């Protein structure tokens, strides 16, 4: 596994430093072409398929999201949606469908205002901001067509408190 650090420029200001990992687990890797274009690649023994992501990327990880035994790719992108016109952090999940990169879920929203996510123990753990400026750490699990809320690990706390739980 190799890491490449870069700064994301979005909305006219620098957001954060991000490490994008070229993970070979499941054959998925992510390459940043420029500030607003990344390419998700799936390499198998017999195929190589690519999916262009014309958005800034803030997170990338892999794991078996839907429990089917194959590795999926989770990509955090910054974009607006049909229902949420303001640009925000979104979660896209891609699967390996016979050696091809195919969308599993391109959700417009989890629960709150998504800041970050990770994949642990078959669940997506999220760091989210609420409309009143508080923070929550929540867990989601695949629920047939999309992510289903499991539980709050922490809620109605400061960002610093939420980060401690999220980073452990």
PLM features: residue spans?
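Short, basic, low-complexity termini and linkers enriched in Ser/Thr/Gly/Pro
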Residues: 1-18
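Beta-propeller-forming repeat regions
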Residues: 18-168
